[in-house]
Amino acid sequence: MHAMESRVLLRTFCVILGLGAVWGLGVDPSLQIDVLTELELGESTDGVRQVPGLHNGTKAFLFQESPRSIKASTATAERFFQKLRNKHEFTILVTLKQIHLNSGVILSIHHLDHRYLELESSGHRNEIRLHYRSGTHRPHTEVFPYILADAKWHKLSLAFSASHLILHIDCNKIYERVVEMPSTDLPLGTTFWLGQRNNAHGYFKGIMQDVHVLVMPQGFIAQCPDLNRTCPTCNDFHGLVQKIMELQDILSKTSAKLSRAEQRMNRLDQCYCERTCTVKGTTYRESESWTDGCKNCTCLNGTIQCETLVCPAPDCPPKSAPAYVDGKCCKECKSTCQFQGRSYFEGERNTVYSSSGMCVLYECKDQTMKLVENIGCPPLDCPESHQIALSHSCCKVCKGYDFCSEKHTCMENSVCRNLNDRAVCSCRDGFRALREDNAYCEDIDECAEGRHYCRENTMCVNTPGSFMCICKTGYIRIDDYSCTEHDECLTNQHNCDENALCFNTVGGHNCVCKPGYTGNGTTCKAFCKDGCRNGGACIAANVCACPQGFTGPSCETDIDECSEGFVQCDSRANCINLPGWYHCECRDGYHDNGMFAPGGESCEDIDECGTGRHSCTNDTICFNLDGGYDCRCPHGKNCTGDCVHEGKVKHTGQIWVLENDRCSVCSCQTGFVMCRRMVCDCENPTVDLSCCPECDPRLSSQCLHQNGETVYNSGDTWVQDCRQCRCLQGEVDCWPLACPEVECEFSVLPENECCPRCVTDPCQADTIRNDITKTCLDEMNVVRFTGSSWIKHGTECTLCQCKNGHLCCSVDPQCLQEL
């Protein structure tokens, strides 16, 4: 296939994909949100009414004066967000006609104070603003200079494709930018507003029609079918890059696992480990069984598990009977002898005395009682009255003889006890007999059988031959069997926060935060009624610790370092106050040489004559001066003193209003153009209130601060969340603060500050540029793209990142504590 044919097929494929999704704005409802239809606006909706639109195909609505509340219901908003949530390719489409000088919100998606997506048009500053939150949850604002509030119909399209942003106005591509990728991970409770930010702010005034959100690539085609399409989109490309990064991560993890597996295999080749059990010096292998007294035991996973032996009744032949055998738990058949009307077991002896008193000893052998030869008896060292005759021996013993010292059958947990003429077995305390001769005994579980003396507030724990009474949590011991409540508060053995009160309870305690603090008792944080603004921290009840550059009970007041003399800028620079900071900005006629010295020392003169940045006409000669220039008339020549401004000749003494700013006037003074804001004379009844809002005395022109408490007069200005705000005839208009140019490779936005600063260490930079050509080589020699992160091989708490082609690793202290 030729290259030309390939390109044609690819383009055709992209066009088919695009048209199949958007044709007629109704083919695939799952990809679009028809906002006006879903909100069910009508004549009964306060603040809006239906009016003729740009066309008659759909309804158009006039958004009138406040108050109004055009907000999607919870169910409707959630339907919107289900389509939008976690999508990186979507387009906002709207047809509108906004009245002159209105500053209003077209649509807003926000949760609490976090604006996830808000589109705003300012007629005061002639710009379109996009407010959004990135994937790092940081707020961003993109400003597009454009006059949208001109009382004319416009078609607006704002298309997102991952980090690619395109703004079309009336089917013309106005702006195309690479931005931080917006976050569409919308939490529950997020709200959707149309034509306003909330009930009190951002009222759009004008007409809206065809308000749609399309969750698809190149949604602007629905509004302008003839526009060019790009295939693949930025989001497609970003997805491919993301997949490559994921595959790299999988490869790295797989390599690490393989390396660890090889190490383990090498160790396993050197040794063989098997779990065994050792009993009384004998070692048993896994699953091996044995008999231990009256129990059958098995070695399972290195643990001994035993069950009581069940003894079957033996079926003995004639001249035999069941009897215990040494070393065996169960009875076995044993031969018997009949003698003098009684049965004797094999080996059992009995004495018989003759009429003369002579002792004869018999023993059962081969089922017959046979005479045992008398070998004589040892002498006794006790009187005859203390001598005892035995039934199994002709030799007497002294009273107190230790029969247990001879051979006996008492096994583990059984003890031998001496009687007057023999030895018997007896179970130890806490054990019970497993057979009638007490030779074998087992532990009694006093806890399970209720044979313990543990009282309330204790737990019974069985031990070999006994039990223990353990105190329950929150109790302390009185004696071996009882416990009483423990006052953790009194003994300071509680987990309450230092700013909490401890209350003792039965079996425990409760923690309650002190007045002025909030939390669950174990953790209490200071509570400041009015909050701490501008990054301040509440450190005690209604006490804010303000960051550098702010002061006031709530850190609401910016310290003007310039006017209060805290800083001294170079003579070639002016001190510009910023919220929490300041900036030495080069004065007119100077520019920075690229060193960006904080005090303005790097400001140097601009050669207006050499660069053409002057207003001298052709009949004069431009002479450069330090911080300016001079238009000089050649000797002997009569010069007009005219000026050149924006390509047009202005005569000396001429005054004119700027075309793009009706509130500024300029004049030509002997070759120099001087421009300034219009002087506001509030005594003049014809004063332009749009240029001089401070001259508007009407209460209806006052504005309410975003906190809902402070009231401003028309013309007042203030700073709110790194934005400059102004009250203009009842409308609040806010725009991002103008930050000094940061012309360095790496920058960082310090916490609680509004403007970025330069840093030399790329690992300190918090901005990761969208440049996949910059890569890093990790410790496993795997190539990583800029923006990727991973846990360093061989560690658990070392996080590495590839930032702008630089490898940056750091140890997480919290992770180390959790190990």
From Swiss-Prot:
Disruption phenotype: Deficient male mice exhibit infertility, impaired binding of sperm to zona pellucida, and impaired sperm migration in female genital tract. Postnatal differentiation of the initial segment (IS) of the caput epididymis is completely abolished in Nell2 deficient males and continued throughout life. Ovch2 is not secreted and Adam3 is not processed into its mature form in cauda epididymal spermatozoa, leading to inability of spermatozoa to pass through the uterotubal junction and to bind to the zona pellucida. Residues 400-442, 443-484, 485-525, 526-556, 558-604, 605-640 form the EGF-like domain. Its main location: secreted. InterPro entries: ConA-like_dom_sf, EGF-like_Ca-bd_dom, EGF-like_dom, EGF-type_Asp/Asn_hydroxyl_site, EGF_Ca-bd_CS, EGF_dom, Growth_fac_rcpt_cys_sf, Laminin_G. It is found in: Secreted. CDD domains: EGF_CA, LamG. Changing residue 503 to A: Abolishes binding to ROBO3. Abolishes axon repulsive activity. It holds the Pfam family VWC. Residues 67-231 form the Laminin G-like domain. Residues 1-24 form the signal peptide. Keywords: Calcium, Disulfide bond, EGF-like domain, Glycoprotein, Metal-binding, Repeat, Secreted, Signal. Expressed in brain and testis but not in epididymis. Expressed in regions flanking the commissural axon trajectory, including the ventral horn. Residues 275-334, 701-759 form the VWFC domain. Plays multiple roles in neural tissues, regulates neuronal proliferation, survival, differentiation, polarization, as well as axon guidance and synaptic functions. Plays an important role in axon development during neuronal differentiation through the MAPK intracellular signaling pathway. Via binding to its receptor ROBO3, plays a role in axon guidance, functioning as a repulsive axon guidance cue that contributes to commissural axon guidance to the midline. Required for neuron survival through the modulation of MAPK signaling pathways too. Homotrimer. Interacts with NICOL1; this interaction triggers epididymal differentiation. Interacts (via EGF domains) with ROBO3 (via FN domains); binding to ROBO3 induces repulsive guidance cue for commissural axons. This is Protein kinase C-binding protein NELL2.
